Amino acid sequence: MKNVSPSYLKHHFLIAMPHMADPNFAHTLTYIVEHTANGAMGLVVNRPQELNLADILEQLRPDIDPPALCQHVPIFIGGPVQTDRGFVLHPAGKTFQATVELEGDLALSTSQDVLFAIADGVGPAKSVITLGYAGWEAGQLEAELADNAWLTCPYDADILFNTSSELRLEAAARHLGINLSLLTSQAGHA
């Protein structure tokens, strides 16, 4: 008997299908940070919230006025879990107090010093800052994939860092040769 290992989606994007009913994930593009037999963790990368980096810095270091450029650095809703916890996806190279190197020259930092470095102009030139994350229990993401809730797409740094947030979902679908507006959840009958 052939031993088949499961296929995990670490370092991929999840594209929410147009019929996604969960309001936390409708019309989202999610980067999968980790996916194992024990579950998965991802960050929604196309849902900016009202906050910007200046707002966060005012809370973290109230004695220093944030640079004006920080007002133009969006903070994304990374998912519904631990929405007060920050995550910063950025190109690998610079490391901070809590930086994990991911695949494909990508890194994830979770310490405040990365935010200060970005604000002070010495941090990563490109980044996606989120509050919260998306989490799936063992088998949950696999079940959602089997129910056609998601499409999967290989990670592409250009989509994450060089595409405006409102165009990332469509860009990932285009990467697969798909137009999301033409998809349906209904099966056809021949």
Swiss-Prot record:
Gene3D superfamilies: VC0467-like. Pfam families: DUF179. It comes from the Bacteria. SUPFAM superfamilies: VC0467-like (SSF143456). InterPro entries: AlgH-like. GO terms for cellular component: cytosol. Belongs to the UPF0301 (AlgH) family. HAMAP family: UPF0301 (MF_00758). PANTHER family: UNCHARACTERIZED PROTEIN YQGE, UPF0301 PROTEIN YQGE. This is UPF0301 protein Pfl01_5311. It comes from Pseudomonas fluorescens (strain Pf0-1).
